[in-house]
Amino acid sequence: NYQAPIRLIKQVAERNCKIRLVQLSSLVALCPHPYLAAYSASKAALQTYCLALQEELRLKGSEMRVCLYILGPVRTAIFPPELQNALGGSQLQMSQEIAARRIIGLLQQGRSYAIVGKRYRLLAWLMKLLPQRWIIRLIGAYLRKGL
């Protein structure tokens, strides 16, 4: 989740091509999730790298753009069924098709950073209101039900 994308981004950046590189991140980058510690850390590192690189490229006058889009849970096979159920099952997860359509829309609008989906933007906003420790405890209790 971190090393391979960074290596690829560096190789493309060295060529200074006129290209938009799309990198997907996750809400876990904004608030670490218990039971997903390594995933949370890798997404946070990748997100931080991309945000810093966006500014570096802008200051250099590079034609390359790094677009960073943050997603909440998307219906994929990445998580075991028990954890998917703990994440609210399919009703709380965005479909892959909707996620793809929204990302394409953001690219067409020229947006280089966004939290994809109203529900997930609301969650990110709410996470700013409470102390992070409280949020981590709530998420841990919620996820533990599915393990």
Regions found by a protein language model. Give the residues of each.
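Hydrophobic structural elements of the Rossmann-like NAD(P)H-binding subdomain
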Residues: V22, V66-Y69, F79
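C-terminal helical subdomain
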Residues: L68, A86-A124
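Residue(s) in the substrate-gating loop at a strand-loop-helix junction
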Residues: S26
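Active-site-adjacent segment of SDR/Rossmann-fold oxidoreductases
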Residues: R15-N16, C31, A52-M64
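Active-site loop-to-helix junction immediately N-terminal to the catalytic Tyr of the SDR YXXXK motif
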Residues: P32-S40
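Short, flexible catalytic-loop segment of classical short-chain dehydrogenase/reductase
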Residues: L71-P81, N85-A86
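Active-site helix of classical SDR
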Residues: I9, S42
